[in-house]
């Protein structure tokens, strides 16, 4: 455990200016970001007598291995820089108000030619407009069903849309006039987009104009004696009014505002936000965060004095992330991410700076204030009651989970005689079918919970091939690849740390950030416990690799199937954990997650191999022209017997491409026709190329990329179901 005095900046080197500071752990990972009006005063408070610090603050400073800072000219700049760093580094000791992916929203895919309306749960995407979030999915579907009478927009998936386009008949919704059937050309793309835009305007609060327009059209149809159209418009108006009844007016002055409320205890805080647009509540959102994770001495603050800090942290993180979305994606109400008015229970200490920052994000004046009387005060009290209820329910739900996870980690520590509880556990597993498509997975659990952004998968290169596989050698290969990366990244961090200025300036940018991905180096952070799926041979192989690489601070165990024995290197007998223990359950869950993730990648790799075509390797031949070739000749077998001239008869195929096609199909005539040119064409991309290692990672909207570099579908945060493991994969 580092001693704070070992990295304390020299006396007089910390400036007495406003700025933002970062604490890093010995591995270079940023663990806390904060800002201060006076860096000298704030940082010196961290290096006081450690025994006088609050336990949570003490844990942060003793975990850290270095501190850095950046001086800024104004507090608004400090506010922006602090938000950017928290978003970039995801420090473990900072409070994070993450989107609750379980809240359903109504999504409108404006980035498609024919926009689609559907219920969605997951991270926000650019080019998609969102309305909500709603507390229940059925509420969205009920409202959508009502509005489709008036706005018959597309709701089907891309696959259904293409299928009905091919068969030339609309779906059931098209026959009952709840879809304008753009799939069969009943309306043009422009007409359908206008329907969708009217739908968005209605949900965004611009309802009066739509209702008045419909009433005028109904009156005109009646005067023209078109009573059928008038009756349909009358029903449409009734449907709109029924939908409006579900969003009662709560603020009669047509206010656009967000009302924020908090409920706290000594360890946690719940926050609720009501989004009011046009005087109506358009959405509700809630979070619960652990105050224990922040380096602020919460226990020294009373319930009233900690609220300004919570308000400041929430406003900077929430509106910073909302404004960072593509403006075309929209916010919850389908309009500006920052409303004209933000109502909070108390004003933060730097309310003027935050209000200026919010106004900059919006592009116009934003008011930040506390409601004092009237309807806004009453609604704020309702939001406050919701926050208290959310905190109470959360504590009941999480009490058992937190207790069991703590007991599991402590039980593993005692059973394996570890120096400390294994807060970070990594597990690897191998998957293949009779030695083909051999792959491996690496999953990461922190504090007993999966950290899917750190998941990786691998294609076995040396220990498998030609229909054979050696599980023990595969375990050794993956262990070596993982910890070679660890040593390499750790070496980069150590080398970069030596470049730190004597005055405590920032580390070189390449220290903690991977230049290839722009993200923190994940492999420089080692596990406390490394679990392999297998018994004594597998764990011995992994331990031998760690010894070879000089990794001495990582414990290794193997979890054997069937008897669920825990094997420790160098021990003749396994450790037997009680069948009902939380420790064994956690290890099983980690092992099963690694197994599931490996099988997911194996099936993907096997599917690509089984559906691959020789035409896939032809340079410049895309999917459209491949389809045209097969459609023209009827099959690949007939294509093989064709000549260059016959292939050139297919639209879009020239002589060079035709020659390359015959060369890829391996026909005898190809060599004569192509000569040296065909031999110079690139060969088909093989598994080795497909599985080339990549260190790239992706955002919260996408899944992290794999060590093998071929995509990481299984680790996406939006993944809601576990794939079923079949008997064919092991």
UniProtKB/Swiss-Prot annotation:
Entry coiled-coil feature ranges: none
Complex formation: Interacts with UvrB in an incision complex.
Any single GO CC term annotated in Swiss-Prot or TrEMBL for this entry: cytoplasm
UniProt gene name: uvrC
Primary location recorded for the protein, binned into one broad class: cytoplasm
Keywords from the UniProt entry: Cytoplasm, DNA damage, DNA excision, DNA repair, Excision nuclease, SOS response
Protein's organism: Rhodococcus erythropolis (strain PR4 / NBRC 100887)
Protein name: UvrABC system protein C
Pfam families from the UniProt entry: GIY-YIG (PF01541), HHH_5 (PF14520), UVR (PF02151), UvrC_RNaseH (PF22920), UvrC_RNaseH_dom (PF08459)
